[in-house]
From Swiss-Prot:
This is Sodium-dependent dopamine transporter. Changing D121G: Increased binding affinity for cocaine. It is a multi-pass membrane protein. Changing S426M: Increased binding affinity for cocaine. Residues 60-63, 139-235, 285-308, 365-404, 467, 548-550 are extracellular. 10-fold less sensitive to cocaine than mammalian dopamine transporter SLC6A3. Residues 1-24 are annotated as: Disordered. It is found in: Cell membrane. Na(+) 1 binds at G42, V45, L417, D420, S421. Residues 1-13 have a biased composition (Polar residues). Sodium-dependent dopamine transporter which terminates the action of dopamine by its high affinity sodium-dependent reuptake into presynaptic terminals. Also transports tyramine and norepinephrine, shows less efficient transport of octopamine and does not transport serotonin. Plays a role in the regulation of the rest/activity cycle. It comes from Drosophila melanogaster (Fruit fly). Keywords: Cell membrane, Disulfide bond, Glycoprotein, Membrane, Metal-binding, Neurotransmitter transport, Sodium, Symport, Transmembrane, Transmembrane helix, Transport. Disulfide bonds join C148-C157.
């Protein structure tokens, strides 16, 4: 650190854990501000922005849904997003070390969020592998999901042209199939109430199946060869190869840290916007497109009086922004200390929400075209999730001139949307463990190779003929209630134990002005209520897991709850361990374990007769500090 308080790329003053005696360390920082912004945007903007938000907006009152969505975004989503970015930038460590320094009693929060990210990465990359498989399949003059004369097709298969000729709505009533309260996250959005990732029923009505539906379910997934989660069947080696390619891409993007991933995201984060723009222009030129957009945006303000609409809005906001996975904290820890994290939080949150809104025009312009072509209602083709991007949208693309081109860029968009979100989840784990265990940091390349090898081996279960059942189980339980509980404890630890006043001073020290009263009220009161609201409503509506007509056995649901509980239990388990291993009376132990690491170091130095500026780990230059500004 220079005399003026400037932080160089090579050396960043920062406090360490108790097992480290120095107060500064070598920490890599982003080579440019844009690298950080693109990484955060790439993580937050993922598949759910394309397949989830537009349908929610349509289902919950059209344009009126923007009212509860905007309120939940402002009072719950952005404050939590801002909080986690600020924590990461100020403490300059991954989740485990950060929480160990902030509130030692709640160090288990760090372990919990790392374990949640670990579970999610087991299955999230399978979605990317599906996208890659479709991408490879698109290199043909005739897209394979357009006809019914393939070996995987059944006599009930109907191509799109036959559907149009007979006016049979074989796409099916998707809104019925996907009538859910809280929907699929698939990394940034997770099932909360037993709703189904049903793709086998998509495209199925009155005994008929669309060609696109049979291609996905009978060829890509081969679900017809499995009876359930107890019958995974053989590994599909084409999918296993695609999954391997995905992990190789992830490895060579992350093995050197942010120096490599920060450059890769220039493509993976920006390419989807180019494709969305192209698809938007193309969609608006299709017949019937404005009918779809009308359904998407026409406001029905009576909908906002329904509790489930507000739950949908809150759930979408929370899981779309993605606090609690440790990703925001990890990415921000590589910022320069005086970076304006407040501006970054507002900018990236706005871009994330705007992307979701624009994606709605891309999706519903094509759904309007499908409804117009098939002679059915929008309700009969409007859906979300895998059924939208792997069945409905591909079927529509196949009818356009130059369909191969449209298919290639669409699935490349899905691939890149998934990849940079996967980068974030993996980096959260790597950074947290590297900061807590220095040996891992010194052998990062080997550790990342081992981590992705483990992911691949476990991911093979999702590449089997019954792998979708395993995938669906993880999607339901890996990061639903557990992430909500973890972030609830984050909000409590920061606001009520560490203290919003102290946290505000930390932010003032970084950016020159403290957060205003509004942010403090949100952190202290609104955010915890926001999280409890989502959690309690989800628990009330909980139903055992199903998929189409298949009901998961009791042992599968029990396994799912064990997975969910294994991460959350780290919070009390680590707290109990800390209480038992800390000397002193019970009251003294609580005092020590709720005292931030910096204060403990300050007290230790004062007791040793040493009083020095280094006892308070702040980086503000008093001569250049800015005056407080209320925001």
């Amino acid at each position: 650190m220079s005399p003026t308080g400037h932080i160089s790329k090579s050396k960043t003053p920062t406090p360490h854990d108790n097992d480290n005696n120095s107060i500064s360390d070598e920490r890599e920082t982003w080579s440019g501000k844009v690298d950080f912004l693109l990484s955060v945007i790439g993580f937050a903007v993922d598949l759910a922005n394309v397949w989830r938000f537009p349908y929610l907006c349509y289902k919950n009152g059209g344009g009126a849904f923007l009212v509860p969505y905007g309120i939940m975004l402002v009072v719950g989503g952005i404050p939590l997003f801002y909080m986690e970015l600020a924590l990461g930038q100020h403490n300059r460590k991954g989740a485990i070390t950060c929480w160990g320094r902030l509130v030692p009693l709640f160090k288990g929060i760090g372990y919990a969020v790392v374990l949640i990210a670990f579970y999610v990465d087991f299955y999230y990359n399978v979605i990317i592998a599906w996208s890659l498989r479709f991408f490879f399949a698109s290199f043909t003059n005739s897209l394979p999901w357009t006809s019914c004369n393939n070996i995987w097709n059944t006599p009930n298969c109907r191509p799109f042209e036959s559907q149009n000729a007979s006016r049979v709505p074989v796409i099916g009533n998707y809104s019925d199939l996907y009538a859910m309260g809280n929907q699929s996250l698939l990394y940034n959005e997770t099932y909360m109430n037993g709703s189904s990732l049903d793709t086998s029923a998509v495209g199925h009505v009155e005994g008929f199946q669309s060609a696109a539906s049979e291609y996905f379910n009978r060829y890509i997934l081969e679900l017809n060869r499995s009876e359930g989660i107890h019958d995974l069947g053989a590994i599909k080696w084409d999918m296993a190869l695609c999954l391997l390619i995905v992990y190789l891409i992830c490895y060579f993007s992350l093995w050197k840290g942010i120096s490599t991933s920060g450059k890769v995201v220039w493509f993976t984060a920006l390419f989807p916007y180019a494709v969305l723009l192209i698809l938007l222009i193309r969609g608006l030129t299709l017949p019937g497109s404005f009918l779809g957009i009308q359904y998407y945006l026409t406001p029905n303000f009576s909908a906002i009086y329904k509790a489930e609409v507000w739950v949908d809005a809150a759930t979408q906001v929370f899981f779309s922004l993605g606090p609690g996975f440790g990703v925001l904290l990890a990415y921000a820890s590589y910022n320069k200390y005086h970076n304006n994290v407040y501006k970054d939080a507002l900018l990236t949150s706005f871009i994330n929400s705007a992307t979701s809104f624009i994606a709605g025009f891309v999706i519903f312009s094509v759904l309007g075209y499908m409804a117009h072509t098939l002679g059915v209602r929008i309700e009969d083709v409007a859906t979300e999730g895998p059924g939208l991007v792997f069945v409905v949208y591909p079927a529509a693309i196949a009818t356009m001139p130059a369909s191969t081109f449209w298919a290639l860029i669409f699935f490349m968009m899905l691939l890149t949307l998934g990849l940079d979100s996967s980068f974030g989840g993996s980096e959260a784990i790597i950074t947290a463990l590297s900061d807590e265990f220095p040996k891992i940091k010194r052998n990062r390349e080997l550790f990342v190779a081992g981590l992705f090898s483990l992911y691949f081996v476990v991911g093979l279960a999702s590449c089997t003929q019954g792998g979708f059942y395993f995938f669906h189980l993880l999607d339901r339980y890996a990061a639903g209630y557990s992430i909500l509980v973890a972030v609830f404890f984050e909000a409590i630890a920061v606001s009520w134990i560490y203290g919003t006043n102290r946290f505000s001073e930390d932010i003032r020290d970084m950016i020159g002005f403290p957060p205003g009263r509004y942010w403090q009220v949100c952190w202290r009161f609104v955010a915890p209520i926001f999280l409890l609201f989502i959690t309690v409503y989800g628990l009330i509506g909980y139903e055992p897991l199903t998929y189409a007509d298949y009901v998961y056995p009791s042992w599968a649901n029990a396994l799912g709850w064990c997975i969910a509980g294994s991460s959350v239990v780290m919070i009390p388990a680590v707290a109990i361990f800390k209480l038992l291993s800390t000397p002193g009376s019970l009251r003294q132990r609580f005092t020590i374990l709720t005292t931030p690491w910096r204060d403990q170091q300050s007290m230790a130095m004062v007791l040793n007769g040493v009083t020095t500026e280094v006892t308070v780990v702040r980086l503000t230059d008093t001569e250049t500090a800015k005056e407080p500004v209320d925001v």
